[in-house]
């Protein structure tokens, strides 16, 4: 046999090419090899052996091993399917045959013989196959004369059959699988027959009693004689007779039913007197010829697969019979198996005969040596070695195969396919509770052992109204606690091309998934399409999400355009794919609490299946819906105590809900290593199953968890005892924690296999720190483990608040299971990897497990990067972010002054996405870099981004001769493999033409002034330029046009596609050689003159020189080059040129003699022209140009295929190079323009200066090389400039030659330009939902509430008309009043404050109600109280109360006043409308009333009085000087009425007003007129306070023509002294816009009496709205006409006594869709509504522009929630976040509001703002 040897020299044999510590030794001629297969397992840990073999099978070097395992598993599956149900049920599911080794009960049970037989064959054959695959030339079929013999015992004989039948190693998997099948079938037969002889006791999980005893020091005859006597005397049935199963010279083995074996040792004196040992034979009888017959044998081997094998293979190596000691005489496979099975079943073992047979064969062939292959040494091998020791001429030794399995790999493992790869995690990011906005802050929470639970924040919902600790109120939560992300609405909408409106309506968890995905990708160094594994078509996204809170609650309050796309789960990962342009799959997965980890498992599966090469995965959860809290409370899931999860605590009562967003980036390990990624952790295996046998769907099941864990460990080939940390699910529920600890200890710390002191197992659960993130719980746990691996520490567990759960095993310490109560070190250990398990299960029954190990250790590279200068770049999508990124980088450099500059450059260039705001610094040191970065900070605001219209065009300009040293030493040649390869290939082409090598002119072989031949010099120049051009192109910089100067034109022609590289070299060399041959050096000269040709001609001495030569009128020189307006090169005889140079120098012109051998473009070249043209005609092929060629010869641009030919080259050699005319012509034809980037291709920049002198503007101009400067410095600076101009540089190519030694740094992530996009859930409709519970609640509490009528309560005022309910205790009470707005005094008060012609219940009326109820409660609870002073605080009116038109029907409101403790001095008030006799659940106003001391108020106001008086005096001065407006009583109220509010006479208390901007004071006189019953008359309050409203609606500092302002409330209202009829006061206010929202204004109104502040309305708020909404906001509720009224703007009336300034461009707030301070009572119409956005998002609307284009721009800005300044001409609609959905909306509004009819594809046809603006101007102006 080729791979192991043969018994016949004519057959092929394995011959290794070398030896190793564990290899087949070279066997010389005449030597033999014996392979022995035992009938016992090796003494090693079987589980570990099988795990190691499984790991080897995943290696590409062991494809045959993998195939054998697969074939053997398939064979066993087939056989199991054929078993009867009763037996089949005993065998658990198994993925591979190796899984069965861990099922101890199965191997000891009834089918133990079948299972162990199959496993023994499997381990022997797998070891043999793997061993030979690992050998050098392991598949060799070279011949040798080695003779191989096979021997085995018992089942081991079956293994020998596979070896004998396999002609090559590649045949072993099929033959081996058949052996495994027959071994299993044999075991089944033996069990069935033996069961008839002695049944196994029922429910016996042990291995039972032995069926064989060995008796030493007796002969077979003695034993047989005694047995015969016993059988005869007892009349033993034949089948039950004991028999000899093995015979040797020193012992005899007897076999039979265990009971009969025991019996004979009791009844027989002979046997009682013998020593004996019971053998581990528990599966039944073999070697029993009196039991088994041919039919039995046939039943074992009669399989279709053996028939197929029989046709393909025949025995090739002799197998020695253990009965005869001779080879089996089989000719076919079937015969061989028949003989072997027959021998195992019927023949006694006589090993001595085998030893003698092998020794005889060794003597016969006169062997000089013998190598014995064994799995482990054993007694039979010892006997064989002893036999050989008696043969002096034969030296024998053994080679154990088992040690190969665990030997260290000399080479790194290469997966056999994607399915066997490990998964590397290369990037991670998060947003976690407790302010953890990144992974480092998350680690700080873990490391410090923090519990970050808190009360449910107000931005989610009002916890006070939605929480009921008693659990009686419908839809209320039983807990007020959770763990929450800070400000989950923060988002950089413009970065992700989303409009503010879309961002607002998009679920914040989906937004944060997008953000963290970017950060994780950024940290992973992901750049799309950089490598094969980063191909965008092969990247998928996988996210777990189990709730839609924001869609269900927040956006559902006002469903708009993005309700579906912003809220449905599928759009989360879909949006990530869309933004990054990933074409791989995107999955949103919901498996409840295990969603995130199950998703990561699915992502791993996608990578293993080869569906994707990179996966972005994670989980997300942001809690805003009180329903889920209520539902989980009702299901008894949630803890009621103030803590995160009390994991493993004795009092654990449920989990604490949590937010969280986690994103990770995964690749197959080999791809990650190939891509030079940072590997954070390695996933070895992952799996998901279901707790099908749990007692309920929500109840966890330890058995299912254990099964899954074992399955994952088995797949990965990991010993459970090698796992040192388990991150448990640990929700803090009694059932969950108890079940999980059972599964964990059962697998990782079993009682039967103890952990040693050096194998501690730590357990933990992150939920004790940050709560249970539900869908993100698993990724959060995984993130914790990754950080533990990174930080080399285990953080403390903080879940046990009291004592440990009593249900936990009491022997955790004995099992070495540890709970880390303090931080524990977890360092790397040489030779042993840290391995952890993340466990996760779900209330829906799912279990997910991920097995993770530490990343491979990376060796530090000592290789020094040879590049002298490096490019570090910073980019961003906005100026704010650019500044932030610069600041973060500077901070990083300050913290890491020793950072590797090459690594930093590599990370910021090749491993980052780049954006339109760019900064690039070429630097050689960190200190310089930090200084340069800092210098950019002050100019960020003026920094211009690159155009969004695309990269600028590029022109390559190729240098002519004379610009470099005679000999160069190019660093690029030495260090850049791409450039070097290009030059060497060109040099090879040159040498192939018989030309000299030009490399010596470039590689530093000579000094700089060493002069090479013109041929070498010119070839070196042109080839260097070609290589440089190719190098630039490899960096992604491709020319749009080329221009060559003189000799440089040859390189330009090649780059333009006219000449091949070979032809270019040919022409350059031929021309140079002709010059060398036909022209003398030194006779002519070229001189560069800093002057124009006209200036040169004007020099008198030049003309005189010509005359003196007798050639008057003819120049004494030739014009070689016209390079620019004042750059000219002259050629001629050396002597004449020296004279010309002297003359011009004296005339003041700078002259430089060029270092060239010949005077090109002069008469010196005439001798070569004919010959050169002829050879160019025949020797070169001219192709059409692929790029425009700017021709200095012709002074024009060449586009056609006819112009460049041999004659062109002739003329170019002789005639003038007119670079000036060429560039001017290119400019006229628009071949070049001011946006062009100029790159000089040559040894030194020359042409760039020419171009700059010719063109008025040059975008950027950079050289490739610069004389006297390190190439890397030049290239780095040039690349930085090119990159900053907008060209996308292939930085990965720039670093390719050095990447092996470069490292990706963990730099700060992107600095987001965040704004808070958040729709607030308002009210309590989640509680009520149309149910009657809360109505019934009022009824159910009726006994404690005493309905009162007039006789019970005497309280009657105009606004507080009836007390309908009241409840009083000693210190607490609730009072509910009901009033009819149609009651005359109340209605008069409302009509005294008319807006839009409607009576409006002003805030002063609400104040009177509050004062009245406050006074009533105080007198009831504390009747003796005196001097009651009340502060109405935090008044918030969410909806205006407008009086009905119909005054005949009542219009009721109810106001409740509640205090829980009057001693606390706080009363809570709520206003509600009454419909159909029932108060609405939703209030329209709220306030708090505080009982305070008026004396204390007066004291606090004393310091402010001086300031207020000084401001009043200043306003008086401004009015006196004519700067401030002084308005009379009538004028003031006429303006007020014209602009917004028409006050009744009693309200008109302001006698005069002085106003300057938004600051004013008024003299006030309160009316003495009486009418109505009030506590504080509303017209008094209004008179002293409505100055603020007057300023906001009348001042010319506001755009009152297009906007109006209303107040939703104030922070406080206090009157230290009563307002008295006829009293005189002075009011002062200054309103100030808030920084967060310029449409919201705040101010304090001070009320003075006799120059003393006696009252104050603090922080009164006004909001600005478009006047177009006035009709909608303020119309009578019972008047439907306003719904159909015109939408034209209601402008203020003009009066003759006032002047108005021109309306200014003012910022108009985009009102929130849902807000706590919205005034309107009805929804706004679409055409009049301003769009939704967040605070601070403004739109600059220039109201004085009447053009359709301007209006359209304003409409676009308003709809998208942008500023007009954002609508720059080159900005695309995609960048603004205007997608197809919004484009339809805008198109419709164009039609409705502007009369511009467009279709929905408008923004495809006109993709930028400039395009749209131009179209509108053209067609609608």
UniProtKB/Swiss-Prot annotation:
InterPro entries assigned: Ac_transferase_dom_sf, ACP-like_sf, Acyl_transferase_dom, Acyl_Trfase/lysoPLipase, Ketoacyl_synth_AS, Ketoacyl_synth_C, Ketoacyl_synth_N, Malonyl_transacylase_ACP-bd
PROSITE patterns assigned to the protein according to its UniProt record, in alphabetical order: CARRIER, KS3_1, KS3_2, PKS_MFAS_DH
Domain Carrier: 1743-1820
First-level EC class: transferase
Keyword annotations: Multifunctional enzyme, Phosphopantetheine, Phosphoprotein, Transferase
Domain Ketosynthase family 3 (KS3), chain residue ranges per copy: 420-854
Chain residue ranges for the region called Disordered: 1684-1704
Comment text on domains: Multidomain protein; including a starter unit:ACP transacylase (SAT) that selects the starter unit; a ketosynthase (KS) that catalyzes repeated decarboxylative condensation to elongate the polyketide backbone; a malonyl-CoA:ACP transacylase (MAT) that selects and transfers the extender unit malonyl-CoA; a product template (PT) domain that controls the immediate cyclization regioselectivity of the reactive polyketide backbone; and an acyl-carrier protein (ACP) that serves as the tether of the growing and completed polyketide via its phosphopantetheinyl arm.
Residue ranges that the Swiss-Prot or TrEMBL entry lists as coiled coil: none
E.C. no: 2.3.1.-
Domain PKS/mFAS DH: from-to ranges: 1361-1671
Modified residues annotated as O-(pantetheine 4'-phosphoryl)serine in this record: 1780
SUPFAM superfamilies per the UniProt record, alphabetical: ACP-like, FabD/lysophospholipase-like, Probable ACP-binding domain of malonyl-CoA ACP transacylase, Thiolase-like
Job description of the protein: Non-reducing polyketide synthase; part of a gene cluster that mediates the biosynthesis of a yet unidentified natural product.
Region Product template (PT) domain, residue ranges: 1357-1676
Cofactor entry: pantetheine 4'-phosphate
One example of a Gene Ontology biological process annotation: fatty acid biosynthetic process
Catalytic residue positions: 593 (for beta-ketoacyl synthase activity), 729 (for beta-ketoacyl synthase activity), 772 (for beta-ketoacyl synthase activity), 1393 (proton acceptor), 1582 (proton donor)
Lineage, top ranks: Eukaryota, Fungi, Dikarya, Ascomycota, Pezizomycotina
Protein name: Non-reducing polyketide synthase Preu7
Gene it is expressed from: Preu7
The organism of origin for this protein: Preussia isomera
Region described as C-terminal hotdog fold: 1523-1671
Annotated disulfide bonds: none
């Amino acid at each position: 046999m080729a791979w192991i040897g043969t018994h016949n020299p004519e057959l092929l044999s394995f011959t290794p090419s070398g030896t190793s510590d564990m290899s087949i030794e070279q066997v010389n001629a005449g030597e033999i090899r014996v392979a022995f297969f035992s009938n016992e397992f090796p003494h090693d840990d079987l589980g570990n052996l099988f795990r190691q073999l499984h790991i080897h099978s995943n290696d590409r070097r062991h494809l045959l091993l993998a195939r054998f395992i697969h074939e053997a598993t398939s064979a066993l599956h087939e056989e199991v399917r054929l078993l009867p149900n009763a037996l089949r049920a005993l065998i658990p599911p198994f993925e591979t045959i190796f899984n069965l080794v861990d099922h101890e009960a199965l191997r000891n049970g009834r089918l133990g013989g079948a299972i162990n037989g199959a496993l023994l064959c499997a381990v022997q054959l797998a070891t043999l196959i793997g061993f030979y695959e690992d050998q050098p030339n392991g598949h060799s079929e070279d011949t040798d004369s080695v003779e191989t013999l096979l021997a085995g015992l018992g089942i081991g004989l079956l293994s020998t059959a596979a070896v004998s039948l396999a002609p090559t190693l590649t045949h072993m998997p099929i033959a081996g699988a058949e052996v495994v099948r027959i071994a299993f079938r044999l075991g089944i037969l033996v069990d069935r027959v033996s069961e008839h002889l002695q049944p196994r006791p029922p429910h016996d999980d042990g291995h039972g009693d032995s069926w064989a005893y060995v008796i030493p020091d007796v002969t077979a005859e003695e034993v047989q004689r005694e047995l015969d006597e016993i059988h005869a005397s007892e009349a033993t049935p034949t089948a039950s007779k004991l028999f000899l199963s093995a015979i040797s010279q020193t012992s005899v083995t007897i076999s039979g039913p265990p009971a009969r074996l025991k019996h004979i040792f009791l009844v027989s004196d002979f046997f009682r007197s013998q020593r004996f040992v019971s053998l581990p034979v528990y599966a039944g009888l073999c070697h029993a010829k009196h039991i088994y017959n041919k039919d039995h044998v046939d039943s074992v081997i009669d399989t279709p697969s053996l028939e197929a094998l029989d046709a393909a293979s025949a025995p090739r190596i002799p197998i020695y019979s253990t009965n005869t000691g001779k080879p089996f005489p089989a000719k076919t496979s079937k015969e061989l198996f028949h003989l072997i099975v027959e021998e195992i079943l019927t023949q006694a073992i006589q090993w001595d005969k085998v030893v003698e047979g092998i020794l005889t064969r060794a003597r016969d062939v006169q062997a000089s040596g013998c190598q014995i292959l064994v799995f482990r040494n054993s007694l039979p091998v010892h006997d064989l070695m002893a036999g050989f020791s008696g043969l002096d001429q034969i030296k024998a030794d053994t080679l154990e195969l088992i040690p190969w399995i665990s030997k260290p790999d000399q080479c790194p493992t290469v997966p056999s396919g994607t399915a066997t790869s490990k998964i590397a995690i290369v990037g991670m990011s998060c947003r976690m509770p407790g302010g953890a906005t990144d992974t480092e802050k998350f680690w700080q929470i873990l490391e410090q052992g923090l519990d970050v639970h808190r009360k449910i924040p107000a931005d989610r919902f009002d916890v006070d109204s939605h929480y009921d600790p008693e659990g009686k109120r419908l839809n209320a939560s039983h807990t007020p606690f959770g763990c929450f992300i800070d400000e989950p609405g923060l988002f950089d909408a413009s970065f992700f091309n989303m409009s503010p409106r879309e961002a607002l309506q998009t679920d914040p968890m989906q937004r944060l998934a997008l953000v963290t995905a970017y950060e994780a990708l950024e940290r992973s160094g992901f750049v799309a399409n950089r490598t094969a594994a980063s191909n965008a078509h092969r990247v998928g996204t996988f996210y777990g999400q189990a709730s839609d809170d924001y869609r269900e609650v927040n956006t559902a309050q006002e469903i708009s355009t993005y309700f579906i796309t912003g809220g449905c789960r599928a759009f989360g990962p879909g949006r990530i794919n869309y933004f990054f342009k990933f074409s791989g799959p995107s999955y949103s997965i919901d498996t409840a609490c295990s969603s995130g980890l199950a998703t990561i498992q699915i992502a791993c599966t996608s990578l293993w299946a080869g569906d994707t090469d990179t996966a972005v995965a994670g989980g997300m959860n942001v809690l805003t819906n009180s329903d889920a809290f209520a539902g989980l409370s009702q299901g008894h899931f949630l803890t009621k105590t103030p803590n995160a999860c009390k994991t493993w605590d004795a009092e654990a009562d449920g989990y604490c809900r949590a937010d969280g967003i986690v994103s990770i980036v995964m690749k197959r390990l080999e791809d990650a290593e190939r891509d030079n990624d940072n590997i954070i952790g390695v996933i070895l295996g992952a799996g998901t199953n279901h707790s099908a046998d749990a007692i309920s769907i929500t109840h966890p099941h330890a058995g299912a968890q254990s099964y899954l864990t074992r399955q994952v460990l088995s797949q990965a080939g990991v010993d459970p005892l090698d796992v040192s940390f388990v991150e448990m699910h640990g929700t803090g529920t009694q059932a969950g924690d108890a079940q999980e600890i059972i599964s964990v200890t059962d697998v990782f710390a079993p009682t039967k296999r103890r952990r040693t002191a050096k194998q501690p197992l730590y357990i933990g659960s992150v939920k004790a720190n940050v709560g249970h993130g539900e869908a993100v719980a698993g990724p959060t746990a995984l993130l914790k483990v990754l950080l533990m691996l990174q930080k080399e520490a285990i953080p403390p567990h903080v879940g046990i608040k009291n004592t440990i759960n009593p249900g936990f095993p009491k022997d955790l310490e004995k099992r070495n299971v540890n709970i880390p109560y303090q931080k524990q070190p977890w360092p790397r250990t040489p030779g042993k990897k840290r391995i952890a398990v993340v466990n996760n299960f779900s209330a829906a029954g799912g279990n997910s497990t991920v097995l993770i190990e530490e990343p491979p250790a990376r060796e530090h590279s000592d290789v020094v990067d040879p590049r002298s200068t490096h490019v570090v770049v910073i980019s961003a999508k906005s100026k704010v972010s650019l500044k932030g990124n610069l600041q973060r980088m500077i901070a990083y450099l300050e913290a890491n002054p020793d950072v590797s500059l090459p690594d930093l450059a590599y990370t910021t260039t090749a491993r980052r996405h780049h954006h339109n705001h760019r900064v690039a610094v070429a630097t050689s040191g960190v200190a310089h870099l930090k200084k340069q970065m800092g210098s950019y900070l002050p100019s960020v605001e003026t920094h211009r981004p690159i155009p969004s219209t695309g990269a600028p065009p590029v022109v390559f300009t190729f240098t002519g001769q004379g610009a470099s040293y005679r000999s160069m030493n190019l660093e690029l040649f030495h260090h850049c493999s791409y450039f070097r390869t290009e030059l060497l290939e060109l040099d090879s082409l040159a040498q192939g033409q018989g030309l000299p090598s030009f490399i010596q002119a470039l590689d530093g072989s000579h000094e700089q002034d060493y002069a090479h031949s013109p041929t070498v010099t010119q070839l070196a120049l042109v080839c260097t330029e070609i290589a440089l051009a190719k190098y630039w192109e490899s960096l992604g910089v491709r020319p749009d046009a080329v221009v060559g100067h003189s000799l440089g034109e040859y390189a330009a022609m090649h780059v333009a596609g006219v000449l091949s590289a070979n032809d270019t070299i040919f022409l350059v060399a031929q021309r140079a050689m002709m010059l060398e041959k036909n022209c003398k050096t030194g006779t002519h000269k070229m001189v560069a003159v800093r002057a124009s040709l006209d200036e040169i001609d004007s020099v008198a001495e030049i003309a005189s020189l010509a005359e003196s030569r007798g050639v008057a009128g003819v120049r004494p020189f030739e014009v070689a080059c016209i390079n620019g307006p004042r750059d000219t090169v002259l050629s001629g005889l050396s002597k004449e040129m020296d004279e010309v140079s002297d003359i011009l120098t004296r005339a003041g012109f700078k002259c430089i003699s060029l270092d060239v051998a010949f005077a090109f473009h002069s008469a010196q070249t005439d001798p070569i022209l004919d010959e050169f043209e002829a050879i160019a005609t025949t020797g070169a092929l001219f192709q059409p140009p692929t790029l425009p060629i700017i021709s200095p010869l012709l002074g024009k641009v060449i586009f056609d295929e006819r112009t460049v030919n041999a004659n062109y080259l002739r003329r170019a050699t002789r005639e003038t190079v007119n670079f000036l005319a060429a560039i001017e012509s290119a400019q006229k034809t628009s071949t070049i323009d001011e946006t062009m980037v100029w790159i000089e291709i040559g040894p030194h920049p020359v042409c760039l200066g020419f171009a700059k002198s010719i063109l008025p503007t040059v975008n950027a101009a950079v050289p490739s090389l610069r004389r006297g400067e390190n190439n890397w410095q030049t290239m780095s600076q040039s690349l930085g400039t090119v990159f900053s101009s907008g060209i996308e540089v292939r930085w990965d190519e720039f670093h390719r030659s050095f990447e092996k030694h470069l490292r990706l740094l963990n730099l700060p992530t992107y600095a987001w330009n965040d704004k808070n996009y958040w729709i607030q859930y308002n009210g309590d409709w989640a509680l009520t939902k149309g149910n009657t519970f809360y109505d019934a609640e009022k009824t159910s509490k009726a006994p404690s509430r005493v309905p009162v009528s007039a006789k019970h309560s005497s309280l009657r005022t105009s606004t507080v008309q009836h007390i309908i309910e009241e409840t009083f205790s000693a210190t607490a009470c609730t009072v509910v009043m009901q009033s009819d707005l149609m009651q005359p005094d109340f209605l008069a008060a409302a009509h005294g404050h008319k807006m839009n012609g409607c009576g409006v219940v002003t805030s002063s009326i609400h104040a009177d109600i509050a004062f009245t109820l406050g006074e009533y409660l105080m007198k009831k609870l504390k009747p003796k109280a005196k001097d009651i002073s009340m502060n109405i605080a935090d008044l918030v009116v969410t909806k205006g109360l407008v009086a009905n038109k119909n005054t005949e029907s009542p219009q009721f409101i109810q106001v409740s006043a509640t205090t829980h403790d009057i001693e606390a001095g706080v009363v809570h008030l709520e206003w509600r409308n009454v419909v159909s006799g029932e108060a609405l659940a939703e209030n329209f106003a709220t306030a708090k009333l505080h009982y305070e001391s008026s004396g204390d108020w007066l004291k606090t106001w004393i310091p402010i009085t001086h300031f207020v008086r000084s401001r009043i005096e200043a306003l008086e001065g401004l009015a006196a000087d004519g700067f401030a407006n002084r308005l009379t009583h009538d004028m003031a109220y006429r303006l007020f009425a014209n602009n917004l509010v028409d006050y009744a006479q009693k309200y008109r208390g302001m006698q005069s007003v002085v106003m300057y901007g938004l600051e004013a004071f008024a003299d006030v006189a309160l009316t003495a007129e009486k009418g109505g019953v009030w506590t504080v008359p509303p017209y008094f309050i209004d008179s002293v306070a409505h100055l603020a409203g007057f300023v906001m609606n009348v001042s010319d500092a506001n755009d009152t023509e297009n906007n109006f302002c209303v107040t939703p409330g104030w922070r406080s209202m206090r009157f230290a002294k009563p307002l008295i009829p006829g009293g005189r006061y002075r009011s002062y206010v200054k309103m100030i816009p808030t920084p967060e929202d310029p449409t919201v204004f705040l101010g304090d109104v001070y009320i003075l009496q006799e120059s003393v502040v006696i009252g104050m309305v603090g922080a009164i708020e006004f909001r600005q709205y478009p006047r177009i909404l006035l009709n909608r906001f303020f119309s009578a509720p019972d008047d439907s006409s306003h719904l159909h009224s015109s939408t034209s703007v209601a402008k203020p009336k003009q009066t003759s006594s006032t002047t108005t300034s021109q309306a200014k461009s003012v910022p108009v707030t985009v009102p929130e869709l849902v807000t706590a301070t919205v005034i309107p009572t009805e929804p706004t119409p679409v055409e009049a509504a301003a769009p939704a956005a967040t605070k601070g998002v403004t739109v600059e609307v220039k109201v004085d522009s009447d053009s359709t284009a301007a209006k359209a721009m304003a409409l676009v800005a308003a709809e998208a929630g942008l500023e007009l300044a954002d609508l720059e001409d080159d900005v695309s609609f995609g960048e603004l976040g205007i997608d197809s959905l919004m484009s339809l909306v805008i198109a419709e509004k164009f039609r409705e509001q502007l009369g511009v009819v467009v279709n929905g594809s408008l923004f495809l046809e006109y993709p930028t703002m400039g395009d749209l603006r131009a179209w509108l101007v053209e067609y609608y102006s």
